[in-house]
Amino acid sequence: MEATTKKMAMIEIGKGWAASCLEARTCVISNEEDIYAEPRADTPVLKLDSTVRTALPPGYGIVISGTARNHKTAWEIVPGLVDSGYTGLLGLLLVPTDETPATGSAGGGIVSFSRGGVHARLTVIKLVPDDIMGACGAGAQRLPLKTAITSFKGDEDLLGNGFDHCMESLASIYPDILHVQLDCPVYFGCTGCKAFYRRLGSCLETRPLNELGSDHIYLRRGSAYESVNRFAAPDDVMFVAMYGKWLLIGMAETPNEKLTVELRDDDSSPAALIPFHDTFGQKEAEDAGYDIRAPENCTLPPGGSVRVILRQKLHMGKGRAAFVMGRSSMNLKGVLVEPERVVDDEWVSFNITNIRDAAAFFRKNDRIAQLVALEDKLELMGGVDALPWRVVQSVQEEKKNSSRGDKGFGSSGV
């Protein structure tokens, strides 16, 4: 149990390591003795074990970054994410910066680092609460949809055989939608929709909530058309989007009763085209990141890179930022994700690079990256730590009730 009710980041510093700048809340750990690591033949990534442990209250995490140098090579510490409940020894993953990464193995023999050769920044971050991320479409505005039992050709409100009038709009919703004319009800591209509903933006009326009717679409006073990207609805509503003059709604099934889609005009909350947890996995209270799964099978040749695009957009709002980071288990194998900030209202995307000599393969739904959402901070690494530090004798004694414990070596999902 913590000795104080004030939220603090705890750190236990073992033999051969030191921590500096704790009072300034810019914690850096470094080696006070010569340290050694044994390279692996199948990856150029070097795993370096420290004797440092940390623990945080739920709702916080640590981003590890930094550099290292020995008499032969300059190294970069692969950015890693530490869960609040992890109490094991922190591990550092290093990649050489002055060599061509695709050369493959780190070579034979033991790699040594002299005293002071390793500097790792431990940046404490505050996380966006899970209930905000998970309910990123809930709101006060309502969009009544007409009852639509069948598909109507050329109807102004329901896109049936006449959906070609909105082909340009529909094609803009996701990069790989098929540019062909289909009859509803059928599945259209990757949206998983059988029915589409549309209304001209010029037909949208602005009224107070207490004057909402059942035959029109309303926008709350002061809201903008862009707010339709923030919505909550029954599961069969796959997306709500504004493109040009059209408001577009895609449904997995043709509705047999009146539906209600709630729209949000509060840009301080995240927004999504589909439910957040349909793309990002559920996480435990002590987890820092949300799992990102591969949308399809992929093989990366040695030195190869691929841009992964998810069928998801976010709007984090003021004072918040979301980043895609790699998973330590993949980083260790030499399959790296360069940390990248998610751009509001654009498709969530990121690069994966294989720096090994051998090809890398991942299957659809494999966990390949993670999303971390920051509160009151727009930069992933550096800056002032979100919590003050407290040096303790034993992190594991202070954090006895942690469900994560010492599983893994410090980064989420190992």
From Swiss-Prot:
Binding site for substrate: R327, S328, S329, F409, G410
Protein name: Deoxyuridine 5'-triphosphate nucleotidohydrolase
Gene this protein is translated from: DUT
Cofactor section: Mg(2+)
Any single GO BP term: dUTP metabolic process
Main function: Involved in nucleotide metabolism: produces dUMP, the immediate precursor of thymidine nucleotides and decreases the intracellular concentration of dUTP to avoid uracil incorporation into viral DNA.
Family membership: Belongs to the dUTPase family.
One example GO MF annotation: dUTP diphosphatase activity
Main enzyme class: hydrolase
EC number(s) on file: 3.6.1.23
Catalytic activity of the protein: dUTP + H2O = dUMP + diphosphate + H(+)
UniProt KW Hydrolase keyword: yes
Pfam families in the cross-refs: dUTPase
